[in-house]
């Protein structure tokens, strides 16, 4: 048996210089509530004899407005952090670059195209640090909550259980976003109840359209103007509401045949109107990296307890770790855990619920939700005290 079947040429030589923006980490955005005084760029030089060479590194920020900030340091270690003061940096979009030079000032290598954006102060500002922890207006948070928490009158109950997030599938169709359409969702009442309970919602903004498979293609071609208006008006209407946690880009896009371009279109739609809240997506195939640039939070949904073919509970941890690999640990993973039953199956018991939650945390989840409050509270009300006990216990993760 061969010990190695890989060809001898199957390796990659690292470039001499690599660089990336590490602070701010999330989308390269500076928010006012960060209190950030310096932008940090991590530069790596692929040479072991650096101290003896006397090489230097220069980081620079350039913008069309003529802002020119520069920082220099010696390249004496394989990894170096360069700090550029940013307190007085005007709002706008910038490009960063790093150059490696020898002792005579000759350019040896350079990295350009690192994007930086300083946004105007927002009412609410949510972002992630380098470890993918969520910050809400500067306060760290470990978000936990529910899909399909559809009852405004149950927000306080969920909050008493230690939970901070809520959701409804009413946000999946444009017509239910529009207050002028009969049968639309009562968004003000629902969101106000969430805010009063100290909770925040991740809101869909009509991603399923009119239910036709070609809806997003038509939307992108400008052939669905009514739905486009309903979707964008909804984001504008509630982007400063205190109960907004983020925008829900899509629910299991691969199962609906969605493409990365369609997902990216939805991301831009939300982000151009509201850069202050993250964008989330649930992926049933959480090892599919095609969608990596179309969300800020990856939500895998491993449901191990089934009528047939149940999986070990450790599959939850395996899913979280696999999702982290998919995004290269560059984005947070908030798994969707099981609080419902498959047809012919059963609900998870108290031990299984707690095990799933803390397996996810131990595997590196930076938040989690349950699917779903509607199914669980309606059909498994006896399990609510256990779910609430777990929710209060999870608050210790913060």
Model-derived regions: residue spans:
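Glycan-processing catalytic domains of CAZymes
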Residues: 5-16, 20-55, 83-86, 90-398
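Solvent-exposed serine/threonine-rich low-complexity stretches and specific carbohydrate-binding patches
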Residues: 65-80
């Amino acid at each position: 048996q061969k010990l190695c079947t890989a060809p001898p040429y199957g390796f990659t030589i690292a470039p001499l210089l690599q660089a990336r923006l590490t602070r701010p980490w999330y989308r390269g955005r500076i928010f006012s509530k960060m209190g950030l005084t310096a932008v940090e760029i991590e530069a790596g030089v692929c040479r072991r004899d650096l101290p003896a060479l006397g090489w230097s590194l220069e980081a620079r920020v350039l913008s069309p407005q003529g802002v020119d900030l520069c920082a220099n340091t010696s390249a004496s270690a394989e990894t170096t952090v360069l700090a550029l003061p940013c307190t007085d940096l005007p709002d706008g979009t910038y490009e960063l670059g790093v150059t490696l030079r020898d002792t005579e000032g000759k350019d040896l290598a350079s990295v350009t195209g690192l994007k930086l954006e300083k946004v105007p102060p927002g009412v609410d500002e949510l972002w992630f640090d380098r470890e993918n922890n969520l910050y809400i207006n500067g306060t760290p948070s470990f978000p936990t909550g529910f899909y399909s928490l559809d009852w405004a009158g149950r927000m306080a109950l969920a909050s008493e259980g230690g939970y901070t997030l809520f959701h409804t599938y009413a946000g999946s169709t444009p017509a239910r976003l529009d207050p002028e359409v009969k049968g639309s969702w009562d968004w003000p009442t629902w969101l106000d109840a969430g805010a009063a309970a100290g909770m925040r919602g991740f809101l869909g903004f009509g991603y399923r359209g009119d239910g036709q498979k070609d809806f997003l293609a038509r939307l992108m071609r400008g052939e669905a103007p009514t739905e486009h208006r309903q979707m964008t008006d909804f984001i504008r209407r509630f982007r400063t509401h205190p109960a907004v946690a983020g925008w829900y880009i899509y629910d299991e896009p691969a199962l609906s045949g969605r493409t990365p371009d369609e997902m990216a279109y939805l991301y831009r739609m939300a982000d151009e109107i509201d850069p202050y809240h993250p964008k989330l997506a649930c992926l049933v195939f959480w090892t599919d990296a095609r969608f990596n640039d179309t969300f800020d939070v990856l939500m895998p949904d491993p449901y191990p307890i089934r009528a047939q073919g149940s999986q070990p509970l450790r599959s939850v941890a395996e899913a979280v770790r696999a999702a982290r690999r998919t995004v290269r640990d560059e984005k947070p993973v908030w798994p969707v855990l099981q609080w419902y039953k498959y047809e012919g199956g059963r609900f998870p018991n108290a031990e299984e619920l707690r095990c799933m939650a803390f397996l996810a945390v131990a595997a590196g989840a930076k938040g989690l939700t349950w699917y779903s409050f509607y199914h669980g509270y309606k059909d498994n009300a006896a399990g609510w005290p256990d779910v609430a006990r777990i929710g209060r216990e999870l608050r210790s993760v913060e």
